[in-house]
């Protein structure tokens, strides 16, 4: 705890403290240093009790993973897209497996774009193959890596929304083994938030350990892996999952878990670009902010201090 000597008008209010570990500024209505320290420690302890911890879980390429599992295939090794081919090649792909994304194919592209990209990849593979010839094809990422003479192929799976809902319900029931329904916020068919503040003492686990245990149980029972974010509020949990987790290596099960609090968010993401990577910041908002010279979350924070009218 550090005592700051501030201008007289502020000091008249009492003794001013900054608690470095908790990042809390406190002005106390006491006049003695001893009583101020006691009071500060009490306030910090109460603040800790009020601090929440949230986990955000996103099932990895959910629709595509379900289709892989139903075909007895590994979702992390199979090239597959979920799209209704009957609607022409301009139909939007609802999901793309991670292995196919690794070739530069977007997760929500149109089917003709996927086919064009695959043609480009196969042209490059043909050029590099022995005798400039491709012999056969494969949908397996591992096989394609080890056998350069094979052409990249992929499966087009028609969407089955009712079936995905059944899978989602099964996974939600796994969540309920660990967290009460009132502490779960269902964000979409493949994504949830959990307030896990009160469960650490119950399970004797950290937030990361609890997230990993839940994800591995889902993987064991359904074959579907996930990414998780941990934060001190919903926004930070979501951003940890959407932004930070994408930049860390997955483990052997394809799991990525990232954490953020207010301090690490400021330290690591205030200069991150583009703004559209952040939850609820679309292209429209981003373009309006850019018109005012605002390009990062740090810019937004600084602008908020000096331009309240905005």
What spans do the regions from the language model cover?
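A ubiquitous, low-specificity "background" feature that marks scattered single residues
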Residues: 10, 19, 27-29, 64, ...
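Alpha-helical structural elements
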Residues: 11-13, 20, 49, 57
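Short, positively charged and aromatic/hydrophobic N-terminal segments
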Residues: 18, 23-41
């Amino acid at each position: 705890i550090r005592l700051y000597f501030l201008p007289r008008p502020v000091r008249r209010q009492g003794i001013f403290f900054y608690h470095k570990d908790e990042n809390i500024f406190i002005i106390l209505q006491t006049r003695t240093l001893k009583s101020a320290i006691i009071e500060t420690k009490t306030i910090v302890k109460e603040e800790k009790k009020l601090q929440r911890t949230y986990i955000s879980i996103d099932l990895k390429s959910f629709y595509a993973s379900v289709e892989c599992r139903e075909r007895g295939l590994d979702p992390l090794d199979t090239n597959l897209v979920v799209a209704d081919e009957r609607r022409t090649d301009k139909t939007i792909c609802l999901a793309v497996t991670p292995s196919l994304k690794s070739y530069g194919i977007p997760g929500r592209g149109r089917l003709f774009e996927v086919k064009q990209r695959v043609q480009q990849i196969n042209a490059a593979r043909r050029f590099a193959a022995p005798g400039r010839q491709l012999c056969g094809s494969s949908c397996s990422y591992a096989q394609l890596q080890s056998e350069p003479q094979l052409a990249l192929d992929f499966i087009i799976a028609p969407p089955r929304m009712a079936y995905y809902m059944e899978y989602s319900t099964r996974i939600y029931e796994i969540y309920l083994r660990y967290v009460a329904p009132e502490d779960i916020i269902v964000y979409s068919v493949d994504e949830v938030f959990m307030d896990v503040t009160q469960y650490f003492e119950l399970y004797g686990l950290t937030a990361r350990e609890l997230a990993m245990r839940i994800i591995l149980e889902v993987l064991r029972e359904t074959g579907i892996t996930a990414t998780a974010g941990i934060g001190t509020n919903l926004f930070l949990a979501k951003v940890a999952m959407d932004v930070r987790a994408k930049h860390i290596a997955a483990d052997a099960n394809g799991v990525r878990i990232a954490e953020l609090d207010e301090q690490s968010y400021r330290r690591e993401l205030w200069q991150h670009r583009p703004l559209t990577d952040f939850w609820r910041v679309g292209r429209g908002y981003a373009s309006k902010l850019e018109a005012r010279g605002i390009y990062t979350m740090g810019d937004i924070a600084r602008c908020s201090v000096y331009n309240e009218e905005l």
